[in-house]
Amino acid sequence: MEAYELDKIKVLATSFRGAIEIAKDAGEFDNDFAFPRFPKGCCGDTSDLLAEYLAQHDIYTYYVCGQKGTQSHAWLVLVNTVTVTTDNSDADRKYKSLISVYSEDNDVMLLRKYYNLKDAIIIDITGDQFTNQKCFLYYNIPVYVGFLDDFHKLFRVDQCSIHEPARLWDARCKSLYRAITKYIK
């Protein structure tokens, strides 16, 4: 990945984060259940909204969700920096065999995808919600674009999926997206 590409992503992510803060201050989120407390508790929705904004600029991402204890956190990673493999282990073959016994369709396809994030470029605009928490390293970076750092290593990744624009566009998300993007400079 070229430095100028990372710079472009950082500029876009910073603009999007800034627009969220302006929209919040303007009262755009007063009737929403989560965004009045941005960035606290908004990482999942924010990641989806940012993924859509980046896709509008031909930057494609995976949505990543991780867990540390009872706390979850979501962020994005660039698609072209993630290695995806499938598992064909004995356990998967046995599970597939068991499913085929109970399935009318004996042609069962079971592939678990594994996402190697070791060299992934992370885009996270809500990490600073953990600023006051020692167990999260007092993480205070509002916009992070870079490789896996100590903070993101804290989370056991539970989910990694490609951003699908149509999957999040309920009325609430459409409203949030419009409210945010009208403040992008």
Q: Which residues does each PLM region occupy?
A:
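A structural boundary/capping signal
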Residues: 1-185
